[in-house]
Amino acid sequence: SIPDYAGNNFFNTIGNLIADPRVGLMFVDFQTGGLLQLSGRATVEWAPRDSHDPEALRMINVEIDEVIDRPQAVGLRWERRQNLTRALKVTRRVAESAGITSFYLAPVDHLPLATFVPGQHLPVEVHLPGRAESAKRSYSLSGAAEDKQAYRLSVKRKEKGQVSRYLHDRLRVGDEIVAHRPSGEFLMPPGTDPLVLISAGVGVTPMLSMLHAVANQPARQAWFLHGARNGKEHAFRDEVAHLVKDHQRIGLRVFYSQPDKDDQQGRWDYTTGRVTAQRVLDLNAGATAQYMICGPAAFISEIRRGLQAGGIADERIHFETFGPAAS
């Protein structure tokens, strides 16, 4: 039996099996190089009882027709690494905006933190009340990569997000959380090509880590474009302003879609409206510029299409989507 999980609530694999129940399974033992191949027919158990996995919403049962065992068929050999997780303690909590809170996490064992590349995220495990299994999430590292004392995770509270609600409502200074090594492929491009950082909402978090890195690169030109509903929901406003004020080579553009009365008093510079591809293109960042985009899926799709239509090559457009799976 194979468990199937909710994911994004679309059981695509099950749909395929209903149309054609034939399945092939392959299992690799990377320690010995063994390869086990199974073929058969599958049925879907829509309401599993006494499941071995309480997180599974469906079970796929396979009746095996044929088995092929191929010892040492694979040339690769892997070994399981031990102690892949470590305990981190919350040393600070900072409310960054109306819905985003930063958690500073320092190692309990006082050993050095694993390094990360700006743009990467930190996988964490959280034990929620009433659940036997830990909930796993990944949150972008929003602090400077040079900070060796603590990681900073900046999390948006979502009403339907079990983990984000727990972090905001229950996790306090002194509490511990389990974390894996930083990972992720949404990386700040190396070199000196101009960099355009484009974000909306909580998508600002990986961009902030990149902005810290750019501020320490004296020869790199950059632009930081961010969209928020209003000033109350604009996270890291002071921090970004501080990073760019002494660097004429870093441009800053802020957009509020629904500015309130406090915003209209003029303390902060902003443009009413949203971040659009045309506004990005108007920067004239140059033929070698790299474009980093992070935010809701619709936002990313719109910016990407606009940049492509404006002649920006696909290999210069990099993006990461934030959605319900990250809550």
Predicted regions span which residues?
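Ferredoxin-reductase
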Residues: R80-E176, H180, P194, A228-G231, ...
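Intrinsic disorder at enzyme termini
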Residues: D69-R81
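Histidine-anchored nucleotide/phosphate-binding helix
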Residues: L141, V204-N216
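Short, structured beta-strand-loop surface elements
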Residues: I2-A56, E66
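Alpha-helix N-cap/helix-start capping motif
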Residues: G201-V202, A297
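Short helix-loop-beta connector
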Residues: P189-D193, G286-A287
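Reductase modules of NAD(P)H-dependent flavoproteins
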Residues: A222-S327
